[in-house]
C-alpha cells in the first residue's frame, strides 16, 4: 500500500499502520483457482480507510469461462484491525474525519444503498434491497488477478446538526 495523507484533514496513514496486507486498488495479486485469497483489503482514499472484498463465488460471465466474484464488505478497521474473513460487517462507517477536521464526528456515514445488509429491521421499513440492485461486486480473472468488471454501489448519509442562533433584543446574533 502507498502512504496517504490529504491536505483537507489531518488524517494520514502509512503501510506500517496496518496489521494485514492492504492493496492500493491499482494492482491485485494472482488469486488462483480455487481462490487462495478469500479476502482482499483495498485502501480507499475517498473514505480514508480500507474496504474489504470477500470471495463470493466463481462464475462464467462477460465472455470468460471463469471469474472470481468478490463482494464489498464494510469492515470497521478500528473494531476488527486484522481485517480477515471473520470480521463482522458494519452497518455504516463514520468517514467524517476524512472529509473535514472542522465538522463533528459521526456526521457523514458510508453504507450500502438502502442499508442493504443492515441488520436492523427498525431502519429497513419498506426497503427491499436485493443483491443484483444494491451489492457492490468486482470480477477478477483468477490467474492474473486482473479486475474485469466492477460496480460500486454505496450510499453517503449525514446526520443533521442544528446549531441554533440566539437572537438578541437588538437584533444581533450569538
Task: Annotate the PLM regions.
Residues 1-65, 72-174:
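Extracellular or lumenal secretory-pathway regions
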Amino acid at each position: 500500500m502507498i502512504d496517504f495523507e490529504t491536505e483537507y484533514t489531518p488524517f494520514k496513514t502509512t503501510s506500517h499502520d496496518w496489521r494485514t496486507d492492504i492493496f492500493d486498488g491499482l494492482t491485485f495479486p494472482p488469486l488462483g483457482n480455487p481462490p487462495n485469497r478469500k479476502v482482499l483489503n483495498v485502501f480507499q482514499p475517498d473514505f480514508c480507510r480500507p474496504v474489504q472484498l470477500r470471495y463470493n463465488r466463481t462464475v462464467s460471465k462477460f465472455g470468460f469461462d471463469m471469474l472470481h466474484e468478490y463482494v464489498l464488505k464494510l469492515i470497521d478497521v478500528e473494531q476488527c484491525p486484522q481485517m480477515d474473513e471473520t470480521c463482522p460487517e458494519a452497518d455504516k462507517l463514520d468517514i467524517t474525519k476524512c472529509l473535514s477536521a472542522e465538522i463533528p464526528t459521526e456526521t457523514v456515514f458510508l453504507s450500502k444503498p438502502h442499508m442493504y445488509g443492515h441488520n436492523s429491521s427498525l431502519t429497513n421499513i419498506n426497503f427491499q434491497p436485493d443483491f443484483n440492485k444494491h451489492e457492490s461486486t468486482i470480477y477478477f480473472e483468477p490467474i492474473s488477478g486482473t479486475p474485469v468488471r466492477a460496480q460500486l454501489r454505496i450510499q453517503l448519509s449525514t446526520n443533521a446538526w442544528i446549531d441554533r442562533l440566539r437572537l438578541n433584543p437588538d437584533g444581533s446574533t450569538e
